[in-house]
């Protein structure tokens, strides 16, 4: 923004909510927990697990950036969110259910891996973004539901286990 204003260069700014999808760093929640479920390792949940996050499938994020780049108003800021808030615990339970189905495990077996751990100091209870502006002004909304995106993501990680390890 400052560079654009200083030098008179056209610009738009985007801010986003939590992304998930293929090729995400293995230490992030979704790929970490996919790997831990495969290996039947604990699923560490901070505090009470009621922290809320807005989740956005990475392909929807890329489409939104493309739209803002081509259709956004010069100098404007657009928040890109999933309109999709989940508590960490609920997200983990959905992930466990899908993983049990995909791995042919007994329903509920992965949920037994959930382990509550001491919370981080200053941990934010909610990370979410108001994406109303991009929706109203540019007509953008996510095209992939959370469950669909999670299923695609799980399939990718299960098919690319070597990548996850390296």
Predicted regions mapped to residue ranges:
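Active-site Tyr-X1-5-Lys
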Residues: 1-12, 37-38
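C-terminal substrate-binding subdomain of Rossmann-fold SDR/epimerase-dehydratase oxidoreductases
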Residues: 31, 35-166
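Short, charge-rich amphipathic segments
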Residues: 1-3, 29, 88
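Flexible, glycine-rich beta-alpha linker
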Residues: 9-29, 52
């Amino acid at each position: 923004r400052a560079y654009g204003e200083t030098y008179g260069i056209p610009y738009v700014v985007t801010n986003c909510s939590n992304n998930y999808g293929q090729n995400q760093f293995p230490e992030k929640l979704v790929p970490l927990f996919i790997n831990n479920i495969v290996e039947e390792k604990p699923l560490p949940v901070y505090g009470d697990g009621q922290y809320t996050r807005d989740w956005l499938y990475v392909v929807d994020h890329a489409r939104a950036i493309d739209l803002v780049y081509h259709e956004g108003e010069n100098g404007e800021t657009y928040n890109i969110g999933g309109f999709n808030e989940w508590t960490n615990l609920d997200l983990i339970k959905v992930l466990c259910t899908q993983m049990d189905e995909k791995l042919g495990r007994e329903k509920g077996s992965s949920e037994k891996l959930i382990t509550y751990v001491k919370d981080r100091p200053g941990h934010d209870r909610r990370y979410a973004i108001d994406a109303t502006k991009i929706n109203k002004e540019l007509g953008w909304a996510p095209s992939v539901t959370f469950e669909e995106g999670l299923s695609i993501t799980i399939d990718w990680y299960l098919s690319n286990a070597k990548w996850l390890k390296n």
